[in-house]
């Protein structure tokens, strides 16, 4: 059987979470196809074709997919889903927005945030803020899955040689509109992918004291995180937040 992995990218570069999701897909199916949907994203499709374990890249280039609107992408996935036994995406903000729509369109139950694959229909996922692990079994013909990427090692981005198949599938649901991006720029590693994280809590007392963490973070090449208490106190923005209600991380040093 064949798995379809939904790639995460910004129309110029593939996100690392895609590589971890492919590892999860390899535990389910013998063949893996990777969907690259976007606008002017040919470079993403070309880099996707070199990923280890991917046999085919489905490349769809249209303005309707430029901003990864879940309403449009979910229709695309539904229309190409017939050949797949499982459809996987990273459990990122985009993945969590997209995959429930896909599951609804296919009339199946989504399997959320898996951390291990026991068999082709049985999975583990954390519950109760990660304090327990649930084992879940799906009887649906098509499995729609989001993957906790920190639980799976990434595949190599360079050792593959996949076919690129360009599709002319264009879908505009007409019910949502992209307004703008508000991006926080930083020279530090992305929190969810960082090997080293320095995190502050309520004990930092105020936002200015978080500046004290920057020097050592720069020396270590670390990302800076924060507890929910620090975020709720207004010390730092919520994109710093680590944990169940924030970002899921798996650094080598915390």
What are these regions (language model features)?
Residues 1-254:
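N-terminal glycine-rich FAD/FM-binding segment characteristic of electron-transfer flavoproteins
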């Amino acid at each position: 059987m064949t798995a379809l992995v939904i790639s995460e990218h910004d129309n110029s570069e593939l996100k690392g979470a895609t590589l971890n999701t492919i590892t999860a897909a390899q535990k389910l199916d013998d063949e893996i196809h990777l969907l690259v949907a976007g606008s002017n994203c040919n470079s993403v499709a070309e880099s996707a074709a070199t990923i280890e374990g991917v046999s085919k890249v489905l490349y769809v280039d249209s303005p309707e997919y430029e901003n990864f609107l879940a309403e449009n992408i979910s229709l695309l996935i539904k229309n190409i889903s017939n050949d797949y036994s499982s459809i996987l995406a990273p459990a990122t903000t985009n993945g969590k927005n997209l995959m429930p729509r896909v599951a609804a369109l296919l009339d199946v139950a989504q399997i959320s945030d898996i951390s291990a694959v026991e068999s082709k229909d049985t999975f583990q996922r954390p519950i109760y803020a990660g304090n327990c692990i649930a084992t879940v079994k799906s009887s649906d013909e098509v499995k729609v899955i989001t993957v906790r990427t920190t639980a799976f090692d990434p595949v190599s981005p360079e050792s593959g040689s996949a076919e690129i198949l360009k599709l002319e599938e264009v879908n505009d649901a007409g019910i949502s509109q992209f307004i703008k991006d508000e991006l926080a720029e930083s020279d530090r590693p992305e929190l969810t992918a960082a090997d080293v994280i320095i995190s502050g809590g309520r004990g930092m007392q105020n936002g200015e004291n978080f500046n004290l963490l920057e020097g050592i973070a720069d020396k270590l090449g670390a990302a800076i995180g924060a507890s929910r208490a620090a975020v709720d106190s207004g010390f730092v923005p919520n994109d710093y937040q680590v944990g169940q209600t924030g970002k899921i991380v798996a650094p080598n040093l915390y």
